[in-house]
């Protein structure tokens, strides 16, 4: 909780990820103050290392993708950009930014284990018994049979990771500033 309050230096929208003992920071609109997302995350990592903490960082267009990268990608700072840079010139039509971003997210999340989707352990075990080990294994499968066999939560978590279903976190309320004053009859020196 204290770390999430400390992180308000980067954005007023910070929250606690209770089950995973982590924090959420919505940096949209604030990253330019630090030279971009990479600069913001580097500053945060440096300050936390100076305090003796070593954390894993990820920035992504969705909460689900950021969580997956922070918990299951190799250690380091991971950034999935909101939009890939448009090529200066192209011989063929270029896919819109959302399509390119989604393809990049699929590529990066595919090798991560199923637990990166934040699914129940029973569902994860059932998927593994069926021979499905990583996110990429279920991305190409038909959705209806997956839902029938493993439940709708699996598809909801997959959709949250790719931004097809909105997901948000509850930001911490700003600490109340306490101001007390007292008027005296005579000036106090």
Predicted regions, residues:
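Gly/Gly-Pro- and Ser/Thr-rich, intrinsically disordered tail segments characteristic of DNA damage-repair
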Residues: 1-189
């Amino acid at each position: 909780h204290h770390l999430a309050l400390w992180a308000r230096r980067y954005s007023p929208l910070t929250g606690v990820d209770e089950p995973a003992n982590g924090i959420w920071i919505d940096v949209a609109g604030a990253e330019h103050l630090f030279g971009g997302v990479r600069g913001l995350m580097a500053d945060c990592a440096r300050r936390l290392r100076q305090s003796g903490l070593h954390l894993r960082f990820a920035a992504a267009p969705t909460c689900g993708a950021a969580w997956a990268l922070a918990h299951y990608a190799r250690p380091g700072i991971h950034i999935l950009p909101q939009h890939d840079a448009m090529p200066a010139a192209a011989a063929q039509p270029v896919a819109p930014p959302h399509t390119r971003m989604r393809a990049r997210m699929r590529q990066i999340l595919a090798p991560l284990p199923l637990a990166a989707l934040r699914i129940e352990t029973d569902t994860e075990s059932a998927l593994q018994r069926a021979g499905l080990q990583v996110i990429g294994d279920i991305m190409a499968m038909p959705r209806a049979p997956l839902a029938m066999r493993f439940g709708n939560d699996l598809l909801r978590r997959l959709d949250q990771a790719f931004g097809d279903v909105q997901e948000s976190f509850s930001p911490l309320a700003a600490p109340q500033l306490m101001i007390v004053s007292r008027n005296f009859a005579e000036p106090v020196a």
